[in-house]
Regions:
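Active-site neighborhood of glycoside hydrolase catalytic domains
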Residues: 399
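Cleavable N-terminal signal peptides
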Residues: 12-13, 24, 432
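Sec-dependent N-terminal signal peptides
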Residues: 4-14
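Sec-dependent signal peptide cleavage junction
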Residues: 8, 17-36
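Second-shell loop/turn segments in exported
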Residues: 46-53, 104-107, 137-148, 180, ...
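Zinc-dependent metallohydrolase catalytic domains
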Residues: 313-316, 320-396, 404-586
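Segments that shape or occlude catalytic/ligand-binding pockets
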Residues: 27-231, 342-370, 580-586
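Acidic/polar low-complexity interaction segments
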Residues: 155, 190, 194-196, 216-333, ...
Length: 586
């Protein structure tokens, strides 16, 4: 296909003559007119094609490849590069339309973390496209190279870099070649690796991403499990059923807590709530090192049990109580079943550890928690005498990460950009505050970790981040040379927007009307469930949240949302911009 530029706003694929005023007017009167209603960064809405007689998957793929005659699209959402294709990865029916999620490929390799959402109505008309296409891949010099490292060379380099013992035998090794965007913005071929090695003393497993041309490891994580207590590690929980009585315990704040538990066929009680979806399970990780080092049990560890319905483990009791409230919030307020709307099992490990974050080597001093997307679980350390596990907002923050992974169908081991990572952190903080307000009512606040006894994780209203450092809240700060684009530091660029909206504050001279927590949270959830993609960036999320506000509450509300984004350095959203009109060459 050839291109010929008609104007700054329209581009044609093939041959297309400029339309006269009369022709435009005639089209507007045509009920079958193909037209764009919304064209904003990462989002196009309207009647974007004529009815198509094909499978929904083919309709979506042809649109993204610029092959649907007469279609309207944004330039950032289509490509004519012959080596680019799109692979359907998920299909759902939503609001009487078929919603498809498609992963972009180049020369049959997935572009890492790059996907789009296309909605097709019953007549084969595309109504919504969300996300962006990676452009100009043919111009990337590293993607013309075909002399990749061999599989044996990859394995050899991996063993050397990760310092795998020479006597360790490979028991698992899988790889997927992808097109990967490096920090410098250039694309290269890389391989995403999952591995397990084992000798008489240890089992070593993890993930890595390696440049297939240079052998550079672009990302790595490894986990080492000692075998000295192998008989303990092999113990499995008996068959469980819901216990008749509730579980009791005290959290790290010495508060009495109640929660559902299970009873095993061995007569013991277990920290497993079988009443919520496919269950909430709390494990003892026994200070396994999450990034390599000594470990007795590994993750998730051993399912926590007790001879009575009372559980003495204060960290476990605190997390179980919090998880119950968090699950209920998402189901009752957003009809979200578990973190992925598939009612997946919720797994959390207490007594976690990361040797890289504890300077004194005392495992009980690990003051952190995390969601691990590859393991599909959360991990909590014992730091601050266990108070971390009792902090509802901290627990909800980690569950918020799971929600981001689950709603965007994101199973990648590393987020594709610093923007995606920052948004993920900011939204996790947002869910932390929302659940605290849901449970504690008027005692909720926008301070992450306010119950930790002097250690504030992030104070969103005062723009204070980790360690008392500045929390960036303006999008333009993200691009400053002095900003290393660390995700937690930049999380305020979205969380402070949502704070302003919920509370009705004036920021940088721009006032917005108070929307309240319930309204803002429903808008954010709609954006995540209907528009957000795995490679979400700041300007795309702005488009998606503003559109979600319009979907639910109309133009007046969406205008307030847009004002809040502008107060934080985001550009004003044009209703229609960068439109492409497609016509197949003959």
């Amino acid at each position: 296909m050839n291109y010929r530029k008609l104007s700054s706003a329209f581009v044609t694929f093939g041959l297309l003559c400029p339309l006269s005023t009369e022709a435009i007017h005639a089209q507007e009167l045509d009920k079958n007119e193909v037209k764009v209603e919304i064209a904003q960064p990462g989002l196009t809405i309207g009647k974007l094609t004529q009815p198509q007689n094909d499978t929904k998957e083919n309709i979506a793929k042809k649109y993204l490849k610029g092959e649907v005659n007469g279609a309207k699209a944004q330039q950032e959402q289509v490509t004519s590069e012959k080596n680019v294709d799109f692979q359907p990865t998920n299909k759902e029916t939503k609001e009487n339309q078929t919603e498809l999620r498609l992963a972009q490929t180049y020369k049959n390799y997935k572009v890492y973390g790059q996907d789009l959402i296309v909605k097709v109505d019953k007549n084969g008309v595309i109504t919504t496209v969300s996300g962006k296409v990676a452009q100009n891949l043919d111009q990337q010099p590293n993607l013309t190279i075909t002399n990749f490292l061999s599989k044996n060379e990859v394995k050899s380099k991996l063993r050397n870099i990760l310092q795998i013992p020479s006597d360790a035998t490979e028991t698992e090794f899988s790889s997927e070649t992808v097109v990967y965007k490096k920090k410098d913005g250039h694309y290269t071929y890389a391989t995403v690796l999952t591995f397990t090695y084992e000798n008489n003393e240890q089992v070593i497993n993890g993930n890595a991403i390696m440049d297939l041309q240079t052998g550079e490891v672009l990302f790595q994580e490894k986990f080492i499990k000692n075998k000295e207590n192998k008989t303990i590690n092999q113990v499995t929980a008996p068959k469980l059923s819901p216990a008749k009585e509730p579980g009791t315990g005290k959290n790290a704040l010495q508060e009495n807590v109640l929660f559902n538990i299970a009873k095993g066929t061995d007569g013991k009680f277990y920290l497993a709530d079988l009443s919520r979806g496919n269950g909430i399970y709390i494990y003892n990780a026994d200070y396994a090192d999450s990034l390599g080092g000594d470990s007795q049990a590994g993750y998730p560890g051993t399912l926590i049990s007790s001879n009575t319905s009372n559980f003495a483990d204060k960290e476990a009791a605190g997390v179980m109580k919090n998880m119950s409230n968090i699950y209920d919030y998402f189901k009752k307020e957003h009809n979200l079943k578990s973190y992925d709307n598939k009612d997946s099992k919720v797994v959390a490990s207490v007594h976690g550890f990361d040797s890289t974050e504890v300077s004194d080597g005392v495992k009980e001093n690990y003051v952190n928690a995390f969601w691990h997307p590859s393991w599909n679980q959360m991990v909590f350390g014992d730091g601050l005498n266990g108070k971390l596990t009792s902090a509802l907002d901290v627990t909800a923050h980690e569950f918020g990460h799971a929600v981001f992974s689950g709603t965007t169908k994101n199973k990648i081991v590393r987020y594709p950009s610093a923007e995606t990572s920052a948004l993920n952190e900011g939204l996790a903080d947002f869910w932390g505050t929302q659940i605290e307000y849901y449970v504690k009512k008027d005692k909720g606040n926008w301070i992450m970790g306010d119950t930790l006894g002097g250690l504030t994780i992030r104070d969103i209203p005062r723009e204070i981040g980790d360690g008392g450092n500045k929390l960036y809240t303006n999008l333009q700060d993200f691009y400053n040379d002095g900003n290393d684009q660390e995700s937690h530091v930049n999380s305020g660029i979205i969380s402070h927007v949502l704070y302003q909206l919920a509370e009705g504050k004036t920021y940088n001279g721009i006032a917005v009307q108070k929307q309240g927590n319930e309204k803002v949270s429903k808008v954010v959830m709609r954006a995540l469930q209907n528009y957000a993609t795995s490679a979400e960036d700041f300007e795309s999320l702005q488009s998606h949240i503003v559109q979600a506000a319009k979907d639910l509450y109309g133009n007046t509300t969406s205008t307030e949302f847009e004002k809040a984004f502008q107060a934080h350095g985001y550009k004003a959203l044009a209703k229609i911009s960068k439109v492409v009109e497609v016509q197949q060459g003959k």
